[in-house]
Regions:
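Short beta-alpha junction loops
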Residues: 114-118
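A short, conserved, highly charged catalytic patch centered on acidic carboxylates
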Residues: 1-110, 120-146
Length: 146
């Protein structure tokens, strides 16, 4: 049974509290399941909506690997970068996400950084303007449920 938006958000908050001190690889597996197996957000791994650990080429080396890329109809929509949930946002985390957004093979306008909070970035490639929304992991948070 599919959850409504508030139920799905509250489930994520409960899970986050359980896994707050886990290492980044555990956090990544959990979020992969949230996007895929649980289908909390309406995406399907089977349909190719979710790409995990896809390598982005720079020169002759595969160096950049976003944690998750969400697609609709085989078109990349946004990238998700995951960090340990107990870690605060840092400039290097933000730079890493913005590097993915501006990568020539992606050039995406939206990125999500998940650490102690969820940060949603809107990046205007034409003027370099960045707007971000900060969403704390709080039960019944209206921004989280959206």
């Amino acid at each position: 049974m599919k959850l409504n938006y508030t139920e799905a958000w509250n489930f994520i908050v409960e899970e986050r509290n359980k896994f707050f001190n886990e290492k980044e690889d555990v956090v990544q597996k959990r979020w992969e399941s949230y996007f895929a197996e649980a289908e909390l957000f309406g995406y399907s791994k089977i349909k190719g909506d979710i790409k995990v650990g896809e390598k982005l080429h720079i020169g002759s080396k595969d160096r950049e690997i976003p944690d998750i890329i969400i697609c609709i109809g085989n078109i990349e929509q946004f990238v998700v970068e995951l960090k340990q949930l107990s870690f605060p946002k840092t400039n290097s985390y933000e730079l890493q996400l913005l590097t993915y957004l501006s990568h020539p093979s992606l050039r995406l306008p939206v990125g999500v950084l998940i650490c102690e909070k969820i940060y949603i970035y809107y990046y205007d490639h034409s003027d370099g303007k960045i707007i971000n929304l900060e969403i704390p992991f709080e039960k019944d948070n209206l921004n989280g449920a959206k």
